[in-house]
From Swiss-Prot:
Assembly mode: Interacts with host TNFRSF1A, RIPK1 and IRAK1; these interactions interfere with host NF-kappa-B activation at the level of receptor complexes. Interacts with host protein UBQLN4.
Transmembrane residue ranges: 9-29
Role noted for this protein: Plays a role in the inhibition of the host NF-kappa-B pathway. This inhibition occurs at the receptor level, by preventing the signaling of TNFR1 as well as IL-1R and TLR3.
Side Virion surface, residues: 1-8
Naturally occurring in which organism (per UniProt): Mumps virus (strain Kilham) (MuV)
Protein name: Small hydrophobic protein
Length: 57
């Protein structure tokens, strides 16, 4: 009797599931990083423009 192998569709299903999990994980991290970066950039820009305005006066 040959070694029991899982059906091919099950393997593909597992791979697709793994791919989806990884994609979702990466997408979440990138979104959070992007939002944080944009927020900090806006804060820095605001403080920098205010500082520049104060210096010009």
């Amino acid at each position: 009797m040959p070694a029991i192998q899982p059906p091919l569709y099950l393997t593909f299903l597992l791979l697709i599931l793994l791919y989806l999990i990884i994609t979702l994980y990466v997408w979440t991290i990138l979104t959070i990083t992007y939002k944080t970066t944009v927020r900090y950039a806006a804060l820095y820009q605001r403080s920098f423009s205010r500082w520049g305005f104060d210096q010009s006066l």
